[in-house]
Amino acid sequence: MAAIRKKLVIVGDGACGKTCLLIVFSKDQFPEVYVPTVFENYVADIEVDGKQVELALWDTAGQEDYDRLRPLSYPDTDVILMCFSIDSPDSLENIPEKWTPEVKHFCPNVPIILVGNKKDLRNDEHTRRELAKMKQEPVKPEEGRDMANRIGAFGYMECSAKTKDGVREVFEMATRAALQARRGKKKSGCLIL
């Protein structure tokens, strides 16, 4: 039996960990150097609830320079991973300010998984010191959950691509959301207006 194909698009601020998350999931290796993404695609196979799913992973650039280019990734999306970084409260603030309006405009009715990346930095001393200088602290799990409720996300997950903690679970939840979303709808997905 042929695998079910689903398209996943990952969005979020620049440097919040989107590409690392995709690379660790699809290639099982952590890239140590940061290279801003323009557009990359990966394919990964995942089995969820006894179903074989071929997940097309569409990486996007978070930097504002790409705001006009990014919508080219959105057509026919089955699920969105909307990311912020646990060591950056500002990236969480951009979820309702920037990312939710953009995604809901181009991808109405597509399920969103809110993902807190860089979970390993929540208790990292250096990270806490740097944030304290700006009177900030790492994002708490309940703040992530509250945000997921606020934006009407399908679910909230936290992970660390560096330690691989929670990575597989993020994509399992995303795949389940993509599979459920198709039921009862002929063809939703994203449209370019």
Swiss-Prot record:
Lipidation (S-geranylgeranyl cysteine): C190
Keywords: Cell cycle, Cell division, Cell membrane, Cell projection, Cytoplasm, Cytoskeleton, GTP-binding, Hydrolase, Isopeptide bond, Lipoprotein, Membrane, Methylation, Nucleotide-binding, Nucleus, Phosphoprotein, Prenylation, Proto-oncogene, Ubl conjugation
Residues bearing the modification Phosphoserine: S188
InterPro entries in alphabetical order: P-loop_NTPase, Small_GTP-bd, Small_GTPase, Small_GTPase_Rho
Region (Switch II region): 61-78
Pro-piece positions: 191-193
Record localization: Cell membrane; Cytoplasm, Cytoskeleton; Cleavage furrow; Cytoplasm, Cell cortex
Modified residues (Cysteine methyl ester): C190
Membrane topology: Lipid-anchor
Gene Ontology BP, a term: positive regulation of podosome assembly
Residues reported to bind GTP: 12-19, 30-37, 59-63, 117-120, 160-162
Enzyme class: hydrolase
Residues with the 5-glutamyl serotonin modification: Q63
PROSITE patterns: RHO
A cellular-component GO term for this protein: glutamatergic synapse
Assembly and interaction partners: Interacts with ARHGEF28. Interacts (via GTP-bound form) with RIPOR1 (via N-terminus); this interaction links RHOA to STK24 and STK26 kinases. Interacts with RIPOR2 (via active GTP- or inactive GDP-bound forms) isoform 1 and isoform 2; these interactions are direct, block the loading of GTP to RHOA and decrease upon chemokine CCL19 stimulation in primary T lymphocytes. Binds PRKCL1, ROCK1 and ROCK2. Interacts with ARHGEF2, ARHGEF3, NET1 and RTKN. Interacts with PLCE1 and AKAP13. Interacts with DIAPH1. Interacts (in the constitutively activated, GTP-bound form) with DGKQ.
Alphabetical list of NCBIfam families matching this protein: small_GTP
Descriptive protein name: Transforming protein RhoA
Organism: Rattus norvegicus
Gene name as annotated: Rhoa
